[in-house]
Amino acid sequence: MRAAAIFGLGCSPRHLKAFQVATGCRELGWRIGMPAAGDGTDAILLFGGDGTIHRHLGQLVKLGLPVLIVPAGSGNDFARALGFRSVRDSIAAWQRFCADQSHVAAIDLGVISPLANAGGAPAPHEPAGHTVLAAQHYFCSVAGIGLDAEVSRLANALPRWLLGHGGYALTLVPTIFRFAPFPMKISSADEIGGSTLNNQPTLLAAFANTSTYGGGMKIAPQAKFDDGQLDVCVIGAINPFKLACLFPTIYFGRHLTIRGVNYFKSPRVRVETETPLDVYADGEFVCRTPVEVGVQRAALKVLLP
């Protein structure tokens, strides 16, 4: 059996020692870094947080190998969604996999597709009204536009130790009082090119494959990574003071009944804004609006606890 190990920021091969000792298998070969297709690798261990996972998703999907997530980042929302709350949980899952290759599941991933020439003049070789999908970007947890994207941008500039100790929440509070609502049009899969689901002043829109982001904020409490659906949460132009009171409820998923919060499920949505806005996913910048956001079923093989 052969395994590869990928390390995110702040991690190194020394973190692999516990997994080598836990298996006690001398016949297990290791390599550091992303394996090549067909090189005999049986599984990949990924040490890091949501951002590290996000940056490798494209290659992981292509390889199609089982991936073990080892929570070693600042937020670890995706690891928690899979059931890994500590490195010890990952070690136990690795021991089971080495014994009988069990507890492997294929889960959904979110997909962001930037729209080229949406709403603008077509390129010379395109018919009027034609929409071009640029390169697709995978995400594992949640994509966001608006207030949460701005908070992610600011949080990424914080020292790593602070980001892992409430930095997202600390950045959020002042941003609430200076962020202006923006017009946004969201169309679901059945209404793309037709009916508008939302065209009101908006503070944020989150598109969730799993339930949490920002280190535990349960923005989409009903989200599941194996149902083929995005959970979409849209927060309208709420008074900043009311919004400041609202955000603590998100940690418990109790915000869905509050007036101004819209929540629905769809396999695919189109998002358009009057001016291009940043799109962040898993805490990382992806592109700018307009975009289509959807789900790719059973895109990633992962080890589960």
Q: What are these model-predicted stretches?
A:
Residues 52-63:
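Short Gly/Thr/Asp-enriched flexible loops that form oxyanion-binding sites at enzyme active sites
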Residues 155, 220-223:
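Short Gly/aromatic-enriched secondary-structure transition segments
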Residues 30-40:
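Short acidic low-complexity segments
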Residues 3-5, 9-19, 62-66, 72-203:
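Catalytic core of DAGKc-family lipid kinases
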Residues 188-194, 199, 224-225, 230, ...:
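ATP/nucleoside-binding phosphotransfer catalytic cores, i.e., glycine-rich phosphate-binding loops
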Residues 144, 148, 204-220, 285:
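Glycine-rich phosphate/pyrophosphate-binding beta-alpha loops
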Residues 47-49, 70-73:
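Glycine-rich beta-strand-to-loop/alpha-helix junction loops that act as flexible
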